[in-house]
Design a protein with these regions (language model features):
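Extracellular carbohydrate-recognition regions
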Residues: 21-40
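Short, aromatic/His-centered strand-loop micro-motif at the edge of beta-sheets
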Residues: 132-154
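Secretory/extracellular carbohydrate-interaction modules
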Residues: 58-130
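Beta-strand-rich interaction surfaces with strong enrichment in secreted/lumenal proteins
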Residues: 72-79, 140-147, 187
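Ligand-recognition surfaces built from glycine- and aromatic
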Residues: 182-205
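Bacterial Sec-dependent N-terminal signal peptides
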Residues: 1-22
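Short tryptophan-centered beta-strand motifs in secreted/extracellular beta-sheet-rich domains
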Residues: 87-89, 146-160, 164-166
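Short, solvent-exposed beta-strand-to-loop segments that form ligand-recognition rims
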Residues: 167-187
Length: 205
């Protein structure tokens, strides 16, 4: 009886472990079919195993949907967001100052329907956009060291039961409750005459 009980525990543990999927994208093969973009405002393209975003515009009074749609890339990830997820990636950017901003896009349906996490100035922002209009937002003071030639960031997004936490270099940038995420669309954007390299996207789902 004892052996049967131990066997059952082992089976349950293995089942629970196998239910968690871990996948990784390094951009070498573009296996997740990321969009690439080139225009006067900038470029989003894969080079040397990273997704590079180059913004050439710092136009004032720009709307969020214009910003997200100008220099951005997205993919539909191999995961079910309803199960919750732990997503990690790295970002390397040149001097972060002035009007420069960058971030990630979650719950992406199209450029006018998504959730945008943005680092700009001394704050981290989260915007919920629907039909091109901001229908919800949250911010938190979050300072990056400015003036360095290159800044390397480890970004982590943890979503579970409607609660969203975003950490940068293991420091909490935002904690948001009651944030429904139903789409597996995910992406990056940059704005304000800057260059950002994204790499090592890893998902635990």
């Amino acid at each position: 009886m004892k052996k049967k009980f131990l066997f059952l525990i082992t089976v349950v543990a293995l089942t629970a472990t196998s239910a968690v999927a871990q996948v990784k994208e390094t951009f070498d093969s573009n296996s997740w079919q990321w969009t690439e973009y080139s225009a006067e405002l900038g470029r989003a393209y894969i080079i040397e195993g990273v997704m590079r975003l180059e913004s050439k515009s710092d136009k004032a009074n720009i709307t969020l949907d214009e910003m997200v749609g100008s220099v951005a890339t997205h993919s539909f990830l191999p995961m079910d967001p309803a199960k919750g997820f732990d997503l990690k990636c790295t970002a390397t950017l040149e001097k972060f100052e002035g009007k420069k901003s960058f971030g990630i896009i979650l719950d992406y349906i199209d450029d006018m329907n998504c959730i945008v996490f943005m680092i700009k100035g001394d704050c981290a922002w989260l915007y919920k956009m629907k039909e091109g209009k901001i229908v919800g937002q949250q911010k938190n003071q979050f300072k990056l060291q400015k003036g360095k030639k290159n800044t390397s960031l480890d970004i982590q997004v943890v979503y579970q039961g409607g609660e969203l936490e975003i950490r940068v270099n293991d420091v909490q940038a935002l904690l948001c409750k009651y944030v429904p995420i139903t789409s597996n669309g995910f992406g990056f954007f940059a704005f304000g005459k800057c260059k950002v390299d994204f790499d090592d996207v890893e998902i635990l789902n």
